Curated annotation (Swiss-Prot):
Protein name per Swiss-Prot or TrEMBL: Uncharacterized protein C12orf71
Domain of life: Eukaryota
Source organism (scientific name): Homo sapiens (Human)
Gene name tied to this protein: C12orf71
InterPro entries (alphabetical): DUF4640
Pfam families: DUF4640
Length: 269
């Protein structure tokens, strides 16, 4: 009996020490025991109050947090957008000229998330394609400029002279251009005044021709129309009696006496 009591005291002391460790440090006796011992611990009934103080949920939370952190690291390694963010941070640090070693860019470069070397090829491909497009557009622009210079060489030379010349030379060229414009203005006015004088002769002849045609048409009307009207009068005279005859017949027919009227008047039928 004494031996059994001593064994029970030793077990109680060990359980109390384990419970204290679990509460203070998060130590769980089940983690150090093998699988066979865990089954015995789970199947055995609760002997003392030490088992009730064990917080198993705390250990589960810790494992869940660790798993979430690992997943986030994997996602960051797989996401290409983080590359852009890192480049932005690096550019920001370079522009500001900050020597802070605790900046986010330095942390990302010196940390465990060394995923920058995974996507250099794709980024370089995109940048090279964009540069090629820009070069092509620039070449097209230069070709268009050459075409414009070929079509308008004088204006291109003048623009070049204006752009390359000094301010006094530019003033002289502008004054010469204005003087040439002033001299050309009276020449243009004289040319315009000469043109109506040349154009007056055909307009005068056209007016005379129109007057002659009008006089000829009026003479024809006066001579021909009366003769035509005289010829039409006898025809109308011959046609008039034929037209009056049916009117008379209709008039006589309208005045015939009907049989009812004869009975009323007393005439025999």
């Amino acid at each position: 009996m004494a031996y059994s009591s001593s064994n029970s005291d030793i077990e109680d002391d060990s359980s109390k020490s384990n419970s204290n460790l679990s509460l203070s440090v998060g130590y769980f006796p089940c983690e150090d025991t093998p699988c066979e011992d865990t089954t015995s611990w789970e199947d055995a009934p609760s002997k003392g109050p030490s088992i009730h103080f064990l917080p198993p949920v705390q250990g589960a939370w810790g494992t869940e947090r660790i798993g979430r952190r690992m997943k986030r690291q994997d996602q960051i390694q797989d996401e290409p957008e983080q590359f852009c963010k890192l480049s932005i941070f690096l550019a920001w640090d370079v522009d500001i000229g900050s020597d802070n070693t605790d900046s986010r860019a330095n942390r990302l470069l010196n940390g465990d998330n060394l995923w920058i070397d995974k996507l250099p090829k794709e980024r370089t491909k995109l940048s090279v394609g964009k540069l090629n497009n820009l070069v092509q557009e620039f070449q097209i622009f230069l070709e268009n400029l050459k075409d414009d210079d070929a079509v308008f060489p004088e204006t291109a030379q003048q623009d070049f002279q204006l752009s390359s010349g000094s301010p006094p030379e530019m003033v002289q060229m502008i004054s010469q251009a204005t003087a040439s414009q002033r001299t050309s203005a009276p020449e243009i006015s004289s040319i315009l005044s000469e043109q109506p004088e040349k154009d007056d002769t055909p307009s005068h002849t056209q007016a005379q021709c129109c007057l002659n045609f009008g006089w000829a048409f009026s003479w024809l009307r006066q001579r021909i129309l009366p003769s035509l009207l005289r010829r039409d009068h006898p025809v109308n005279a011959t046609k008039s009696p034929h037209r009056s005859a049916p009117t008379k017949r209709l008039f006589h027919r309208g005045k015939r006496i009907q049989p009812q009227e004869t009975l009323e008047l007393g005439h025999p039928i």
